[in-house]
């Protein structure tokens, strides 16, 4: 053991003696008891992580991950960002940082205790009356994470079924913990070593719920410093559920005698520790209320669903807020709260703030995200129910208006938080349901519309500017100030004062000491380059003349540095503009070429369409001419053969000759009609005049055929007669 540890142990022993002198029971140490951890692990299934009944269960109601505003701080290969001594807003509001989601604090920061399973060293031992117990193997500091309470995360119906089942199976111990409304952790069969933590009416630990990624997880934390060998206990009456009340063996002076069950007695905690702290409730306030209830003879009933005493909660007067610590406690509970009664009590306390520094603290601790969630909670169709079971929708409306008024009072900041929380969208939906709130909503939205949005400083920005500026990770700014990024350079910005500075504002704390032993106020350790006017290691008094000369030299150096920075920024902007113009020119050429190709394609397509149309019209014209010719042929063929047969001279021809004559006559008549008018169709009915003309044409045609036939016959006879009258040719002897 080191010297410091010896001193610490001595101080702890003094504290125990003092407590004993004041009437408190001295802390018992069990470090001599055998370590039965291995034996205890055989009594249940040890889980690496909780088992969820479905994907939806155990999920934190706010789906958007909330980043902290810390910056990574590596030393000896370890990222010390977001540690116990930091102002990490995630740590303060019970949210763990997640690798690759927190953009500025870097990976593997110190706010990942659940994810990395950074448990305190503990051991299991056998107690006299309580079965197994958990003891500290080393001293545990106040608020240190001890262990995660793991098990099967189930819904309320399954929880009630298991209560009955375990009771019927005569289980001696119960291991249910409420995770959130309607959801429970059951560590009876599957869990972690934390299930063996026993109850005490004067506990040294407490249970708290943390948001890890998108899930709520439950951890056990030290309420005060716990000595090595001391048993680790918490108050079951607040945090744990069981079917039947059981005898308590904690042996504390204030022991109430029983734990579990539905009825609370004299020393029972009426509220979970974190809610009591957020409301400013002290142990003396609880005892006073319990005493009054006992004197009146009334039973003290806790809420079956949430294990809190609604009657006590409703009786509380609003406690004033005195410090940023109070704001932190309230905001950490509000972010996880979906109980309207608890939320309304916390909001009433928050509404009493009349100091801008405290309002800034509320904004800093994911304020806009929290108020967005609260508005949604009170907008829901389900009205608030008071301690007597009465629905009070008017109270819901009152709190919605109260939140709007509080938001209106908040000092001006950047618009980043409003946009990331989407609270403006929630406010825009209110007038549709509550028209009388439209003026309040419009006024608030008008105020927010004037806020400016800035890029946040990122890890990359810090690395680039590291040699030219103060290490931003170690600068603590006054309320209302934040670090933004503008034109590639970090600035200190106060939206309320409309002020931007290149260096930390007055009122900010000095640069925090780094983890090395460098001098914090020296220019080199703070990240500011040494100037000719920097302090020498050996200080000596300067004459007025020498002081003025050094001052002028320093001012000249700063002026030159400022001019150089301006020139560099101007050159950078010119280069960016040149590159932008070149890219624009190339883009315009590409667009022009694309348009040209598009026009050519359009022309080709147009020509193709015109050619197709011309071809179609030609086909249509030919087709129409052929159709008319066919119709005229059909028209004449309907009566020409009959007229030929009736002609007296037709008897001189056989059937085939008459058929051929009919075809020829029809073709001749059709040709004549089309020559007269190529677009005229044949009439539907044959007129007498037309019939007469066709008949005359047929008679004329037949006469010509007969005449030709006779002439041909006569010519043939004449030729034959000539051959017969000619003397035969002479033959030679």
Swiss-Prot record:
Residues 619-718 are annotated as: Binding to RNA polymerase II CTD. Residues 244-260 form the Post-SET domain. Residues 120-237 form the SET domain. It is an enzyme of class 2 (transferase). Residues 506-528 have a biased composition (Polar residues). The keyword Chaperone does not apply. It catalyses: L-lysyl(36)-[histone H3] + 3 S-adenosyl-L-methionine = N(6),N(6),N(6)-trimethyl-L-lysyl(36)-[histone H3] + 3 S-adenosyl-L-homocysteine + 3 H(+). Residues 475-507 form the WW domain. Signal peptide: none annotated. Residues 63-118 form the AWS domain. Histone methyltransferase that trimethylates histone H3 'Lys-36' forming H3K36me3. Involved in transcription elongation as well as in transcription repression. The methyltransferase activity requires the recruitment to the RNA polymerase II, which is CTK1 dependent. Belongs to the class V-like SAM-binding methyltransferase superfamily. Histone-lysine methyltransferase family. SET2 subfamily. This is Histone-lysine N-methyltransferase, H3 lysine-36 specific.
